[in-house]
Amino acid sequence: MDLASPFRGVRAPADSVLSLVDLCRAYRERAGDNEFFSHVTAARLMGVPLPFRLQRRRELDSSVFHPNHPPQAAGVIGHRISRGVPLRTIAELPVAPPAETWIQLGSVLSGDDLIMATDGFLRRKFKLATVEELQWALANSFRRPGLRSLHAALAEARSNTDSPRETLCRLIIRRAGLPEPSIRFTVYDQDGFFVGTPDLAYEEYKIAMDYEGDGHRTDDRVWQDDVERAELFQDATWRYVRLTKDHVDNPPQLVARVRKVLIQRGWKP
C-alpha cells in the first residue's frame, strides 16, 4: 500500500482523502501532550459556519497555553494562548471551549462572516454558547486581536437561528430599514392549535417567513411537507413567505418582496 505523510512522522494511505477529524487524529500522533485544537479548526469541529475558503483549509490550528512554546510543524498553524481555560473533547480530540474559540475567530473573521459564525455558536440545535457566555468571554479578554469586530458581531447576532442563510436574510431586512423580524416565533391558529415555528416572523402583521435551501426543491417529501406547511399558515390567516438562495443573492429583490408584504398587511413605512 502506498503511504502519504500528512505530518512529519505520520503515515496514512496515499489514496485516502482524510476528513478533518482524521487529519486531527493523524496530527495527534506527533503532537505534544499540552496541545489542543483551536481557532478555525476548533470552529469547524463544532460545526460553526465559516467562509468556504476556511471550510476547505487543510492547515490545522493547534494551540498551547502560556508559557509553553507554540507548535511548529508543516501543515500546522501554531498559537499560544495567554490564559488557561477548561478544554472540551470532540471526537476524542482536545479542543478549545466554544466561547474561547469565538474570541479566537475575531482574529480571522470580520463583518457578516463573523456575525454568521456568532449566530452559529448561539444556534437553536446543539447550542454551543449563550449570549451571556460570549459577553463574559469578551469582557474578560484583553489585548486580543479582533475585539472590536467581536463587539460589533455580538450586537447583531441573535440566538436560536438555524442557518447562516437565515442570518443573512435577517441582516438584509434590518439594514434596509424594515422592522426586524422575530426568530422562531411559534404560531397557533384561532383555536389554539400549533401551526408552525417559522425561521422569521412578524407576529403583529401575521407574516411568517422560512428560508428554503436546495433540499426543499430536490427532495419530494420535503417539498410536499412545505406545501402542507404553507396551507396551515394560510388557514390560520397568516401570510407565508418562502425565501430562497436567489433572494439572498439579490438583496434588493428580497427587500422589495418583504416590504410589499408588510405594507399589504398594514405596516406603515
Regions found by a protein language model. Give the residues of each.
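Short gly/ser-rich loop at a beta-strand->alpha-helix junction or flexible surface loop bordering the NTP-binding
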Residues: 1-146, 263, 268-269
